[in-house]
């Protein structure tokens, strides 16, 4: 199974890249974590945010293989505890499809991305910077995998 994290933004600070790659490398070969970066639209003083979101959304959706299960990361989504996420991960594995998780840019996700998603996950009620979300999602997915595989990484 492949977990595909599709995120807006291409130039992240080194700590974001290092943090994401640390959890990415911990996954076993049968549960690969892949990052697909979508270039952020140019935002300026008089930028047309709706147009930027639309373009980012089109690029995100184009990066998703047709058979993938799509999960948006969005404030109105469901909050999952670690055991909840482990259960979701187990269900996704049983479903037999790869999973694409969508992380929007500064203004969030395009409406088309939200509509395409069959699940929506609220990572936190707090507003988090989208670069940090990459690392938190990677760690959370690894922790969920460790729960499902009785790996000592997660402790109750």
From Swiss-Prot:
Subcellular location: Cytoplasm
GO molecular function, one term: rRNA (pseudouridine-N3-)-methyltransferase activity
UniProt-listed Pfam families: SPOUT_MTase
UniProt entry tagged with the keyword S-adenosyl-L-methionine: yes
Keywords on record: Cytoplasm, Methyltransferase, rRNA processing, S-adenosyl-L-methionine, Transferase
Catalytic activity entry: pseudouridine(1915) in 23S rRNA + S-adenosyl-L-methionine = N(3)-methylpseudouridine(1915) in 23S rRNA + S-adenosyl-L-homocysteine + H(+)
Keyword presence, Iron-sulfur: no
Domain of life: Bacteria
Name listed for the protein in its UniProt record: Ribosomal RNA large subunit methyltransferase H
Function of the protein: Specifically methylates the pseudouridine at position 1915 (m3Psi1915) in 23S rRNA.
Family that this chain belongs to: Belongs to the RNA methyltransferase RlmH family.
GO CC term (a single one): cytoplasm
InterPro entries (alphabetical): Alpha/beta_knot_MTases, RlmH-like, tRNA_m1G_MTases_N
Binding site for S-adenosyl-L-methionine: 73, 104, 123-128
Organism name: Shewanella sediminis (strain HAW-EB3)
Subunit structure: Homodimer.
């Amino acid at each position: 199974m492949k977990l595909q994290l599709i995120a807006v933004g291409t130039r992240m600070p080194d700590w974001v890249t290092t943090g994401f790659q640390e959890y990415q490398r911990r996954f076993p070969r049968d549960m690969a974590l892949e990052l697909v970066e979508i270039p952020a639209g140019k935002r300026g003083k008089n930028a047309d945010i709706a147009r930027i979101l639309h373009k980012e959304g089109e690029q995100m959706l184009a990066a998703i293989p047709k058979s993938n299960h799509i999960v948006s990361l969005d404030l109105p989504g469901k909050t999952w505890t670690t055991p909840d996420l482990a259960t979701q991960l187990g269900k996704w594995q049983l479903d037999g499809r790869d999973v694409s998780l969508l992380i929007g840019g500064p203004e969030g996700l395009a409406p088309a991305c939200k509509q395409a998603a069959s699940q929506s996950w609220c990572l936190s009620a707090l507003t988090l910077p989208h670069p940090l979300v990459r690392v938190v999602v990677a760690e959370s997915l690894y922790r969920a995998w460790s729960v499902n595989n009785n790996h000592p990484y997660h402790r109750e």
